[in-house]
Amino acid sequence: MLGAALRRCAVAATTWAGPRGLLHSSRTPGPAAAIQSVRCYSHGSHETDEEFDARWVTYFNKPDIDAWELRKGINTLVTYDLVPEPKIIDAALRACRRLNDFASTVRILEAVKDKAGPHKEIYPYVIQELRPTLNELGISTPEELGLDKV
């Protein structure tokens, strides 16, 4: 279906209206018209929860991580259909601190609260697990900053 739509678009882009309002092809359709539908299946091995956690902790613990990589990692992590483990969030908060990026720390904590959704017990658990790190790094939660009332 997508291939047919792309072929129609490619043909439409190469036609023009003649004197009687008829469409005339100025050239033959290009390679975009030859697109065929392809089925992509994942035949690779699946990543375990421990491997997933280790990958993200390693990513945020890179000593040379810059602000762009930090935001890219946070954005990618937020797109997953899960609430990150506290050890991943801990590594991300420490990366924010190394870069002196306080705004990203608040954004991470707000994203965790949002990802928890209707499960009200998840966010307090994560904050409880992160409390030593938050105190060590001098990071306030969005609730402590009054951002939950805005």
Curated annotation (Swiss-Prot):
Positions carrying N6-acetyllysine: K87, K113
Chain span(s) of sequence motif SIFI-degron: 2-17
Membrane topology category: Peripheral membrane protein
Keywords: Acetylation, Heme, Iron, Membrane, Metal-binding, Mitochondrion, Mitochondrion inner membrane, Phosphoprotein, Transit peptide, Ubl conjugation
Pathway this chain belongs to: Energy metabolism; oxidative phosphorylation
Quaternary structure and interacting proteins, as annotated: Component of the cytochrome c oxidase (complex IV, CIV), a multisubunit enzyme composed of 14 subunits. The complex is composed of a catalytic core of 3 subunits MT-CO1, MT-CO2 and MT-CO3, encoded in the mitochondrial DNA, and 11 supernumerary subunits COX4I, COX5A, COX5B, COX6A, COX6B, COX6C, COX7A, COX7B, COX7C, COX8 and NDUFA4, which are encoded in the nuclear genome.
This protein's name: Cytochrome c oxidase subunit 5A, mitochondrial
Species this chain originates from: Colobus guereza (Mantled guereza)
